[in-house]
């Protein structure tokens, strides 16, 4: 199966569909469009004429990056698409860096997916260089 990885072409309809396929619900379109517009970069993977995977990259474009909404459709998992997408994103970041310098890529793994990221070189927190990652949901009722 062939697939194509694209930078900054992710559309709201595909984002909403893939987001829901991960079991996270369907975000409102206006919120989705704003999130995509304000992302540092977006990535999509197309196979057989449809988008089957996506990710957003947030950050300052120089030193700090955060991987968000990394999704491969459940029926497309296990085919190397996620590995290829993550490798592509890492190379995208590498191209933003100054020679001899490293950027810091962080993420929050979906429960049960930690092993995938660890195989790709990510360290679980806490570890010898940092404490546990922390997060907080801010909700508008």
For the regions a protein language model found, what residue spans apply to each?
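A short helix-loop-beta-strand connector motif used in the catalytic cores of GNAT acetyltransferases and
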Residues: 34-44, 101-103
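A conserved beta-turn-beta hairpin within the catalytic core of GNAT-like acetyltransferases
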Residues: 59-67, 77, 100-101, 127
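Conserved acetyl-CoA pyrophosphate-binding loop and the N-cap/start of the following alpha-helix
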Residues: 76, 80-88
């Amino acid at each position: 199966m062939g697939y194509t990885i694209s930078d900054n072409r992710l559309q709201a309809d595909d984002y909403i569909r893939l987001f829901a396929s991960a079991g996270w619900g369907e975000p409102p379109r206006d919120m989705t469009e704003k999130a995509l517009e304000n992302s540092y970069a977006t990535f999509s993977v197309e196979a057989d004429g449809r988008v089957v995977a996506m990710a957003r990259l947030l950050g300052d474009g120089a030193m700090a990056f955060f991987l968000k909404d990394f999704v491969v459709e459940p029926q497309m998992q296990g085919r190397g698409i996620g590995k290829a997408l993550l490798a592509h994103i890492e190379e995208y970041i590498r191209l933003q860096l100054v020679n001899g310098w490293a950027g810091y890529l962080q993420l929050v793994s979906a429960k049960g997916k930690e092993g995938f990221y660890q195989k790709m070189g990510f360290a679980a927190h806490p570890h010898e260089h940092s404490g546990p990652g922390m997060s907080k949901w801010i909700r508008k009722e």
